[in-house]
Amino acid sequence: MSLAEFGIKTKSGKMERMSFGIARSELMPGAKNAVDVCLGVREGEQVALIADEVSRSVAASLEQALQDRGAQSTGLLLEDLGPRPLNGAPEPVLEALETADVGVLCMTPQPGELSARMSIVRVVERRQIRYAHMIGVTAEIMQQGMCTDYRLVDLLSDRLRERMLRAETLTVKTEAGTLFSAYFDRGLDWVKTSGLISPRYWSNLPAGEVFTTPASVDGTFVCDATAGDYFNGKYGDLQKTPLVLEISGGRLVRAECKRKDLEEEFWSYCHTDENSDRVGELAFGTNLGLSRMIGILLQDEKFPGVHIAFGDPYGSQTHADWKSRTHVDVLTRNCDVWIDRDQVIEKGHYQMNHLGLA
């Protein structure tokens, strides 16, 4: 199905808007921050705005912010393009991104849809357009994480990236039982996604991460917050039923949880392919505007601290030379974090003086 077959017409090569509905006033500050500051949308630019039914109110606020900016947007509702879960990226979505200056995706993930989202990202990276990936976004997030001062987030993220480019080890500890060390390959990049989006790096919104693919990780990671992909929506906050993960040589070797259904499903997911059990991402959360975790991965992974993910290493950004069909983040709470021997996070709070920002 093409854009024309879907019923979206163009005039003189410009994309026309399909309305997502009436924007809610309380979501507009976050929407304007996304459009004006994070994406830097300019008058006359072409924007592909993709959403699902659950995220429709968020899309409506972004649509209004784009209109206020003088941009031309194409709205695409995923449920109009085929059944969910998506087996692949719908053709009208890919076609819209092929001609857009800017792309935005707002959706709630469902099992088996990661490959469809990765197909969208491949178009974004090939064309090097500014792109916001808002997977799991809610009205609450628009009023919290999307109202952050992203220029401050960018400053902290820059300092952390500079430190980690020189670092040899990272140690993370929590009272819940997390204790692991990570080691790094100087040939792999540390990537900053601070919310100020450029053609070089697309970003989740809300933003605030500095991440790499670690050379190796050893120890215990207790996921007592949220897990990624569809696990977040299915199992929610894991504070009362933490997932205890043992890692050796950068690979998951054991998983334990009081909820045996979660334990078995997570273990199976992390053995989908030969690299699904491999730690593909280690990330700092750098969104200083967040005061608490809310049980939604999209925002909680930006909370000050360190988290990891098993599976695909985003090699197009980190330069890791391996791949996986899966990617699942795991989060923990109230981290103590040392870069080499210097403690930079204490109980989930950055020690700004240790980063030259006091």
Could you describe each region identified by the protein language model?
Residues 238-239, 255-310, 316-317:
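Dual-mode signal for accessory low-complexity, basic/Gly-rich regions
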Residues 241-256, 336-337:
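Active-site and channel-lining beta-strand-loop segments
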Residues 239-241, 330-331:
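Short, small/polar residue-rich loop motifs at catalytic or cofactor-binding pockets
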Residues 171, 181, 220-222, 244-246, ...:
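Structured core elements
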Residues 2-240, 338-358:
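Active-site bordering "gate/hinge" segments
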